């Protein structure tokens, strides 16, 4: 590993980054299966210094993530953890949009195509009508946009019987488990499946928030303590991901407030373990966090939608040239510069 000229935190181990408040995670998307884009994103953000990359429990996705990490490691980057995402039930992160394009009226202005941040809908973006499933990561913005109500969501939750074998085959460093209020039993079942895999996890991240629930912050804290008891009994080390406004970081400054507001309400009573922000995070998150009295207790941040949107124009330009972004000697330095602008403030955080 060559750390010359790099921020201090890009040379820290993931555990050291968590302990020092400089942890940065890249979220590829729990339902994202756009393999070419995933490989490019993981290569660029690994070289930029992220400590962890989170993706779908899918062999092809994991292979793409590892190819990107290998590319960056060959250029002097530290190797980030591979984290895989699961849910203990239905969850917006684990869904795909779907509709029958034959039912779409010819005169429809197709607002679904304009609001899709993944460019997963329509002929112009994908070369085919309908939704390109591998690109869709379940943000849900197309659902209310359709004037005819034709778009539906299809759940992508992994069956419990498949979890142990898949994890044993994929060998992640960590797992993220999305949970919702009242799902303590389902959460415990997932934890049992993780133990049955035999994989020695560095951390088990628990992702939870208030978006789409009627819960109060104290009720969420109580749920987290319940999850903590289960994790401790199972021998897992927790990482708490407070999910402000899921899959919205590309929308602008306002989305960053949700995660900061959530952490301000939950952190003082949170169970032991590092706390990381997610859900609406972007370049505005850290400046907003600096006004928070307990900011030094925050372990770090995860970037998802904003990271993907940031590099999207360059990914498309490389695609138009018939090559990957990592293979384009002109474009990949530009992409690396953009990625570093996003992650360096956290890597250099004091």
Provide a role label for each language-model segment.
Residues 15, 304-350:
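Extended, intrinsically disordered, low-complexity segments
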Residues 21-37, 86-107, 134, 148-160:
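Active-site mouth loops of central-metabolism enzymes
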Residues 46, 117, 167-168:
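Non-catalytic positions within long, well-ordered alpha-helices that form the structural scaffold/packing
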Residues 109-131, 141-158:
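Iron-sulfur cluster-binding cysteine motifs and their immediate structural context
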């Amino acid at each position: 590993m060559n750390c010359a000229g790099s921020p201090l935190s890009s040379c820290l181990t993931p555990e050291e980054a968590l302990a020092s408040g400089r942890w940065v995670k890249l979220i590829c998307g729990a339902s994202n299966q756009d393999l070419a884009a995933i490989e490019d994103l993981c290569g660029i953000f690994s070289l930029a210094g992220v400590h962890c990359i989170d993706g779908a429990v899918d062999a092809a996705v994991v292979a793409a993530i590892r190819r990107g990490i290998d590319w960056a490691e060959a250029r002097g980057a530290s190797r980030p953890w591979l984290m895989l995402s699961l849910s203990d039930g239905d969850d917006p992160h684990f869904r795909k949009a779907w509709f029958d394009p034959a039912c779409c009226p010819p005169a429809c202005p197709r607002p679904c195509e304009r609001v899709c941040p993944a460019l997963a809908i329509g002929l112009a973006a994908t070369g085919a009508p309908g939704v390109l499933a591998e690109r869709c990561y379940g943000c849900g913005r197309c659902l209310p946009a359709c004037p005819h109500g034709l778009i539906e969501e299809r759940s992508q939750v992994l069956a419990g019987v498949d979890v142990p074998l898949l994890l044993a085959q994929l060998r992640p460093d960590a797992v993220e488990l999305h949970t919702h209020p009242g799902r303590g039993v389902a959460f415990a079942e997932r934890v049992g499946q993780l133990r049955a895999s035999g994989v020695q996890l560095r951390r088990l991240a628990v992702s939870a928030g208030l978006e789409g629930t009627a819960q109060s912050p104290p009720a969420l804290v109580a749920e987290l303590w319940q999850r903590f008891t289960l994790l401790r009994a199972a021998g897992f080390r927790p990482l708490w991901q407070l999910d402000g406004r899921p899959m919205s970081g590309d929308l602008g400054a306002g989305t960053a407030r949700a995660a900061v507001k959530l952490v301000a309400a939950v952190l003082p009573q949170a169970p032991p373990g590092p706390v990381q922000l997610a859900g609406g995070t972007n370049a505005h998150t850290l400046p907003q966090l600096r006004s928070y009295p307990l900011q030094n207790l925050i372990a770090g941040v995860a970037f998802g939608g904003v990271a993907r949107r940031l590099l999207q124009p360059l990914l498309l330009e490389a695609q138009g040239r018939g090559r990957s972004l990592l293979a384009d000697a002109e474009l990949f330095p530009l992409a690396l510069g953009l990625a570093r602008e996003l992650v360096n403030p956290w890597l250099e955080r004091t």
